[in-house]
Amino acid sequence: MSHLRKNQKEINKADTTFNSSNETCDSGNLVKLTDIDDDFIVELRYATEDNFTGKRVYESAECYIDRETLKMLIEARDVFKKDGYRVKIWDAYRPISAQKRFWEIYPDDNFVARPPDMETMTSFRSTHMNGQCVDITLTDMEGNELKMPTCFDDFREIAAIKNNDPETEEYRNAAYMCKVMEAAGFGASPTEWWHFYDNKNPHPRYLDYRI
């Protein structure tokens, strides 16, 4: 039985009422990943200073994700695991307040989505803010990261899979990850090899549930 089928009931019944500091904030369709599945490696970069801002943006290192998107991620994870790999998550749900901080630090539409109150007709929308997007990489079963085109949050053109030499290990690993994620229903960013968004389910509203 796949992890997706095994965890289906847990995902559907997961409690979305979180801590008292957020009791007035709408948590939407979010679930806490560790309440559902402990087979992912969670390393939220924005809960540390090891990110492009150089500052800790999230108060908590808990990973939240839209419940329907999680079903897709588990489906992809099962394929990766069968092939001998694990999924490491660098980011998932992101509060609106955090997106505002990112825009203040790096206001470039090519790499950072505008916060909702600054969106234009042509700007792209980040589904991190409703929990339907994940930034990931792959590791071996011991947790060692596979070689990829760049580090996380690298804003150079080489972060796009297409800008890499198809003969390299980095390209092959990123292309493989992309293929599996797309088969599970995700869309892939054309500029960031690590960035995948839910391309299957309706997109709910943005949330500002603080983490």
For each predicted feature, which ranges?
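Short, well-ordered surface patches within globular domains
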Residues: 98
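Segments that shape or occlude catalytic/ligand-binding pockets
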Residues: 95
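Extracytoplasmic cell-surface/polysaccharide-interacting catalytic and binding patches
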Residues: 1-92, 102-191, 197-211
